[in-house]
């Protein structure tokens, strides 16, 4: 579908009357369509907000949409607090049905690559948020417990080839990765049923229950292996063997530990599990800054292992490693975009309902922006050498004319062509082996960065001869 049609469908979803039952906590809410902030205004406001304060967001958003006086800050906060965040899941469901399923999709050897991962979003330091979402605990220093800021766990399922967020959850920080993964897969079951799928996940998602579930549904998977998985079978593998198949019997006692009934019943009928084990070896040099300010190169060796059920005839050892380390990394990049460019941790209240709405709305915006970026990437004349500058695309999608056109559903063909050309014009060079440096970044002063670095806000600093450098310990 053309970009204009995709955006018009997306806008019609935001304005759909089907959303009203899902948006109401109080039955009498959002009944007036002639007020300053009916439901469609509130949803668009939350999706496109970008300021550093509530006042800035209101002043940016309302003059572009109507000639009436903007609502007060108290009115906006009140509307946010009575908006049921289930409405964002309904919007996502309609997006999948009306946009994702009909769209032409990129695949790898006929497979969709669906990555699942989670991150933490730092919340305002308020006792209610600490109770609702939890706080980080310090096992090494119990005296710090209760003093860390609250944080919510954000989990998404992401189509890495098509750059589409398929499902999202915002939950308590202590919720484990595996239950969230199953929740994603259950939500997407009808969406993925007609496709060949490869599930990509890191080491915290692996389980016999997941592997047998994928076997039931016909899904393929690539999961980073933990060292304590299938010890007996792995010990029998010849040390120099880098690609083999493990045959694992799930015995009766093991079956009793399976949580989901339908998977347990399936395992009781088919107790043998065939898991492909792939081994990879990496060597690289890393440069560190010593306390004297000198640079020291340290040579690292790393052995990594992966579980999969893909056939070796279809995907060889190098293919598996490439998919995991290259393609799966897009979900990490997506989280970086949400935290640094979309500013998902910029929150205007300590109300847990409002905070959940603010976070989920920016995830919806990410899908709108990805539609524009994908169209611009198709116009990229040198795709192997350059990428469209995502920051520039986000700025254009937040511009006044785009917000006004999206809200009114009057999307000019000429203006959209200009938008795509401008997005494709500003590009960044692809430099192999280059990555964002997290540790040993030099600083001449101590400052408090707003965003996290590798999951840490305000990472530890070590004192060096000429200033400071970030540290991972």
Q: What is the role of each PLM region?
A:
Residues 51-65:
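Short, charged amphipathic recognition helices of the HTH superfamily
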Residues 66, 114-116, 277:
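Generic structural motif
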Residues 79-158:
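Active-site-proximal, Lys/Arg-enriched surface segment
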Residues 73-76:
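Helix-turn-helix DNA-binding helix
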Residues 1-54, 69-70, 80, 91, ...:
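Single, function-defining residue in the core of a domain
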Residues 60-62, 127-134, 170-171:
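"Short basic amphipathic alpha-helical interaction patches in structured regions
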């Amino acid at each position: 579908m053309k970009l204009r049609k995709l955006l018009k469908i997306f806008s019609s979803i935001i304005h759909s009357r089907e959303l009203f039952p899902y948006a109401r906590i109080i039955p009498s809410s959002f009944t007036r369509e002639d007020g300053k902030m009916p439901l469609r205004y509130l949803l668009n406001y939350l999706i496109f907000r970008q300021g550093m304060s509530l006042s800035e967001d209101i002043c940016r958003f309302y003059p572009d949409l109507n000639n009436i006086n903007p609502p007060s800050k108290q009115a906006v906060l009140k509307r946010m607090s009575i908006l049921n965040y289930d409405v964002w899941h309904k919007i996502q469901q309609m997006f999948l049905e009306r946009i994702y399923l009909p769209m032409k999709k990129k695949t790898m050897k006929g497979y969709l690559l669906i990555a699942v991962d989670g991150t933490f979003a730092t919340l305002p330091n308020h006792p209610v948020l600490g109770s609702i979402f939890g706080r980080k605990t310090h096992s090494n220093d119990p005296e710090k417990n209760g003093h860390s800021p609250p944080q919510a766990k954000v989990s998404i399922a992401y189509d890495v080839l098509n750059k589409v967020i398929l499902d999202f959850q915002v939950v308590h920080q202590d919720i484990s990765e595996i239950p969230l993964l199953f929740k994603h897969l259950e939500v997407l079951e009808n969406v993925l049923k007609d496709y060949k799928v490869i599930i990509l996940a890191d080491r915290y998602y692996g389980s016999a229950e997941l592997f047998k579930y994928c076997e039931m549904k016909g899904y393929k998977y690539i999961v980073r292996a933990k060292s304590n998985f299938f010890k007996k079978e792995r010990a029998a593998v010849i040390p120099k063997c880098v690609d083999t198949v493990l045959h694992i019997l799930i015995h009766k006692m093991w079956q009793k530990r399976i949580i989901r009934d339908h998977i347990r019943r399936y395992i009781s009928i088919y107790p043998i599990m065939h898991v492909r084990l792939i081994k990879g070896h990496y060597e690289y040099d890393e440069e560190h800054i010593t306390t004297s300010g000198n640079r020291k190169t340290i040579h690292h060796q790393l052995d990594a292992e992966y579980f999969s059920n893909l056939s070796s005839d279809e995907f060889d050892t190098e293919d598996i490693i490439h998919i995991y380390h290259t393609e799966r990394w897009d979900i990490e990049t997506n989280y970086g975009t949400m935290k640094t460019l979309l500013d998902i941790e910029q929150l205007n209240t300590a109300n847990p309902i409002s905070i959940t709405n603010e976070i989920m709305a920016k995830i919806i915006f990410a899908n709108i922006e990805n539609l524009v970026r994908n169209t611009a990437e198709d116009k990229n004349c040198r795709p192997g050498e350059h990428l469209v500058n995502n920051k520039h695309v986000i700025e254009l999608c937040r511009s006044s004319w785009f917000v006004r056109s999206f809200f009114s559903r009057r999307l000019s063909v000429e203006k959209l062509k200009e938008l795509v050309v401008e997005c494709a014009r500003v590009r960044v060079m692809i430099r192999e082996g280059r990555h964002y440096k997290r540790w040993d970044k030099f600083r001449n002063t101590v400052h408090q960065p707003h965003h996290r670095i590798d999951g840490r806000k305000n990472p530890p600093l070590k004192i060096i001869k000429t200033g400071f450098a970030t540290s991972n310990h």
